[in-house]
């Protein structure tokens, strides 16, 4: 098996494992280790560099270098060590590393917990469930706010949890995929524009913006295509998805977050985003989409169906890409 075909095989098997297993609670996910490592380094960097603006900016660069470097060395080291024992063990380790980079089923499972609590009219339980998958303050959300938060998370993470990892795995295998995941984890932990992380997290946030630039836009166009495909009850509006994407794709502080959110809002014919509370402070945000109908809990299920459609199309494109590169390499 050539390197290209082996890469396609491990990525495809990892994708299929995620579809079946998701993120079982009994399996310790490497992202937790990365998160613990980031927290450990943050404390050390603050002590070593101090709390000045320039010091924290420099410390943020060091944080990025250490986290990405360590992630690359550890993931690459695992594959190298396994390869020394057996090619098949390396293959198995590669599949597992790729599998843990995807977040399709876990995203669906966690968002559907929100859906089920909303259907029971249990606002407190729904707030708690959505707090597990969003970074905003959830105690102030009403039923509509909880629903919107869940839909937005599914839409945004179609890129962060599927398209971007797949993009970097297709280029550099599981090691590059995990470097991306490390940057994305840093951004989710220290990439906030508040007093605590404005300077320390800037390097991580900027690098995350760069790494997600192409995948988020690729994912948005694939999601538009997915919205155009026939659906039961015509639940997706492909034409409106494209319209809202072209109009609202930059209605977010991040250059990438609104790319897929705008497509989802258009496809569902609802209005997402708007002002939100973070760490006890109200953050003013632009709306995404038109208020053509009220957001309802069923939109969480619809967003998940759009997530799955988009994910399978992306995997298909990856397979075609790797096969084409294999053919071209032999010409």
Model-derived features: positions:
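Hydrophobic alpha-helical transmembrane segments
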Residues: 1-179, 183, 191-331
